[in-house]
From Swiss-Prot:
Role description: Binds to the 23S rRNA.
Gene transcribed to yield this protein: rplI
Gene Ontology CC annotation, any one: ribonucleoprotein complex
Family listed: Belongs to the bacterial ribosomal protein bL9 family.
A GO term, aspect molecular function: structural constituent of ribosome
Keyword annotations of the record: Ribonucleoprotein, Ribosomal protein, RNA-binding, rRNA-binding
Protein name: Large ribosomal subunit protein bL9
Length: 150
């Protein structure tokens, strides 16, 4: 019996795959536990439609990520911060990925989730700093920060 897997089943198939399995296994286990459904023509066409829409959504995300990367690479895109600095040259407050994301949105209108900003630890120094950003699984960018003494 041909089935369409609705979830990953170890040793049998991954979500979205169409495979042949024994009738008893399909009816008594996979279909009962909603791990798969029977592969009728209608169900297969439905699956193809879903896959096309997912591909289209991925392409849109990729295009959006490329556009953000182009904006970030412009020389005018320099995120400005002014922080109070102690006698040792370190800032009193630290600059986190959340702060960077908010300033990027406020100064340039670029909306970027703080989870995309790859910051090992909060920044506590002044000067010009470049921070890597993971915009998409295939696209990386760099945010340039200018931290000045207030």
């Amino acid at each position: 019996m041909k089935v369409i897997f609705l979830a990953d089943v170890k040793g049998k198939g991954k979500r979205g795959e169409v495979k042949e399995v024994s009738t008893g296994y399909a009816q008594n286990f996979l279909i009962k536990k909603n791990l798969a459904k029977e592969a009728t023509k209608q169900a297969i066409n439905e699956l193809k439609g879903k896959q096309k829409s997912e591909e289209k959504a991925q392409a849109e995300l990729l295009a959006e990520a490329k556009a953000v990367k182009v904006k970030l690479e412009q020389e005018s895109t320099l995120v400005q911060f002014s922080e109070k600095v102690g006698p040792d040259g370190r800032t009193f407050g630290s600059i986190t990925s959340k702060k960077i994301s908010e300033e990027l949105n406020k100064q340039f209108g670029i909306k970027l989730d703080k989870r995309y900003i790859k910051l090992d630890h909060p920044i506590r120094t002044i000067g010009l700093i470049e921070i890597p950003v993971k915009l998409h699984k295939d696209i990386d960018g760099i945010i340039k920060l200018q931290i000045k003494e207030a």
